[in-house]
């Protein structure tokens, strides 16, 4: 028998299980303690609730993607819109799978890698969509070139006092977003490698852990990309006003950037003990996994609301009437499949990255081409007019981008 204060406690080796006093409860050997009880993330309820939100979000977004492909009347814009919309299925389903394999901390890292790689592309595609809305670089420069950049500490432009908008400004915005498309996948691959060698744990800020360095690099990269997006919006907010840019900017930033800071906060809370860890002889859960599990559950729920907001922000209805033929019919299924193939082709991303980081950037232009109108409406006259306008805009584009202005 051992003594704790004034209360006698039975010796662990003794077969006696009787309580020494009413205030002492003795748990038989082999019974799970309170800490060994499954947490909410490990229950069927958590998987069912998250699954309901995930599959509902998938249905909403997949229908919206289908309608965009069915009414694929403006490929230069809808290509980017469809790519942005795919963030909901990828984020939601990936997070749900991570939650299902919550007790295996290796699987959720692999699932997160797929999610991380795709979110980098969303930033680029959103900026490219804004460029397309405004007609390309030459059209943007014709509106903002030479105007002074308003200096404001609130908007983060105080360091740009005395500078004016130039082609270098647009180049910086593109490069800052493209670097995120490179850094994010590299960090995702590094995470998998470090995880395989036991050098990575979510929420482990020790100097010997790869999590600390991956987080620092990612913070710098994501902050730079966010700053570039904000600078571009700050410069073109009046030009973008017909396209309801506020909701679009908010949704893209919240889905990608806020989810990152949300995960960071949960990791810090677990490190500080605000989120209890799981200590069980039957379940092996690594450090940081509980915070990552809550992050996955929250994302599953958030993607449902993101799907609703994105459905309103990137509606297909503005393109529906443009796709009707003479009989009022939309594109057949074959056209939908070919449109999807064109949307998923990353050729434009690779080409744009090469040109934006090339020393010969001044000779490069990103200019939306005017599509010839349907033959039953404009005929050959409409086609020749499109070519003449395109040639005129090309001349303007050459004059604008031959400048050696730097940002």
From Swiss-Prot:
SMART domains: Solute_trans_a. It is a multi-pass membrane protein. It is found in: Membrane. InterPro entries: Ostalpha/TMEM184C. Residues 1-25, 369-395 are annotated as: Disordered. Keywords: Membrane, Phosphoprotein, Transmembrane, Transmembrane helix. GO terms for cellular component: membrane. GO terms for molecular function: transmembrane transporter activity. The chain crosses the membrane at residues 40-60, 84-104, 121-141, 178-198, 214-234, 249-269, 290-310. The keyword Transferase does not apply. The modification Phosphoserine is found at residues 388, 402-403. It comes from the Eukaryota. Residues 9-25 have a biased composition (Low complexity). The keyword Transmembrane helix applies. Belongs to the TMEM184 family. PANTHER family: ORGANIC SOLUTE TRANSPORTER-RELATED. May activate the MAP kinase signaling pathway. This is Transmembrane protein 184B. It comes from Homo sapiens (Human). The lineage of its organism: Eukaryota, Metazoa, Chordata, Craniata, Vertebrata. The gene is TMEM184B.
